[in-house]
Amino acid sequence: MKKLSYLFILPLCLMASSCTMMVKGIAKLVVKDYNDYTHINISNIQLIDAKGNKKQFNELFTGKTVYLYAWDNKRLSVEQEKSYRLLQERFAKYPDVVFANLNIGSDTASNAFKLADDGATSKFRDLLKIGDPAPFIIGKDGAILAYKGPKPADNILVDYVLYEARNGENGTKSAKQLIKGVNGNEQFKTAKLRDWYSSHFSKNPDDKLSFSVSTTN
C-alpha cells in the first residue's frame, strides 16, 4: 500500500499556499478512481456467513450504506484493526451505516462473509483484484459508490466520503469536495464543512487540518 500523507506542514515547501495546492492535486489524482464502478450494482450477489448461511446482499443490508472491507490472504494488521474499530465507533450513531467484512481468500478462521459461486457473484469477484485489504462503499441501492475507497486510517477523508455516501454520493465527488474545501491556511473554507466536522467528531476543527489518502494495490 502506498500512502500519501495529506499534511499541510511540509518543510520542503517554500510557500505554504503552493505546497497546499501541490498536495491537494496529488490527493485528487488518488481519489479520481473511486467512482470507476458506480454503474455496477451488487444487490443480487450471494454472501455466505461464518455459519454457512447464504443470503443476497440486499436481504442482509436493506436500506443501509455498507462499508465493505475486503481482503485476500493478507489480513488486517494490528494498526489497521485499530483504525477500523475507531471508524466503526465514530459511525455508531448513524443507524443507516453498517460495516461488513469480506474474505476472498482461503482464510476460514476469520469472522467474515465469503462469496458464493453463482453467476452474479462471480462478476463481482472479478473486480476484487486486491493485494492489500481494500474497502468498498456500497450505497443503499446496492451501487458501488467507492471502489477501493478510503481506508479507516485516512483521517477525515474516510469519514466524509462514508457520510456523504448515506445520501448516494459517489466517493470521487465527495472526496474532491472535501479536498477543494480546504484553503491555503489549512482550514475549511465553508461553514457547511465546519459544521459537519463539529457534528460528526463532536469537537471543533483543529487549527491546522491534516488527513491522508491511501492507494490500494
Language model: regions and residue ranges:
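Bacterial N-terminal signal peptides that target proteins for export
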Residues: 1-8
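C-terminal motif of bacterial Sec signal peptides marking the signal peptidase cleavage site
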Residues: 15-18
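N-terminal "domain-start" segment that seeds a small globular fold
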Residues: 23-59
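Short active-site neighborhood of thiol/selenol oxidoreductases, capturing the structured segment around
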Residues: 55-81
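Conserved helix-turn-beta segment immediately C-terminal to the redox Cys motif
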Residues: 64-65, 78-102
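Short acidic, S/G/P-rich loop/turn micro-motifs used as interaction or catalytic elements
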Residues: 73-78, 106-107, 151-152
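Short, internal strand/loop/helix patches
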Residues: 100, 110-145
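Thiol-/selenol-based redox modules, centered on thioredoxin-like
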Residues: 143-217
